[in-house]
Amino acid sequence: MSNLRPGDELLSPVGKPYDTLEEVIGIRPSKGSLAEYGVTYRQVDLLPDGSFDYENIKKAINDRTKLVTIQRSKGYATRPTLSVTRIGELISFIKNIRPDVICMVDNCYGEFVEEKEPLEVGADMIVGSLIKNPGGGIAPTGGYIAGKAKYVDMCAQRLSAPGVGKEVGCTLGNTRSLFMGLFFAPTVVASAVKTATF
């Protein structure tokens, strides 16, 4: 969301985001929200069968649409989780309308579950939490941003300090746990997926 500026618009073509993002976006009023900084938000809900509402997505994309956020996990909703293939189809549709729109995927709970990740099917950025899949159940805190360098750099400038960017950052003495989590994550996620199948 660090790539948004006053006057820009954030669009969710997969319905309402996690409850925890409502105050960040400004769906529920909050100091320092995107809405307070002049960023507007719109969403297009999924169709009742869980498919994308391509007709209304096309209508929703306009000259102010700067960033499209795609939440991969169903979160607290009853909709199905989005596969990487479906995400790729949606991104392709969006890029055919506006190639310059930034497509960001909230990849929480999706890491290591499929052979491909959203960056491999056209996403400009993926973001997620290290306390979920990539942390392997060990990482006590943290998050990640990956994707095209210019967009990641914009996030780094916002999340640390302008001019400093990703050269510094808080580790809270957790570096060892973070690396251990990344090391164990593929095994932990594979075990969870295998267990969930039975």
Tell where the protein language model's regions lie, with residue ranges.
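Glycan-recognition surfaces in beta-rich domains, encompassing non-catalytic CBMs
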Residues: F198
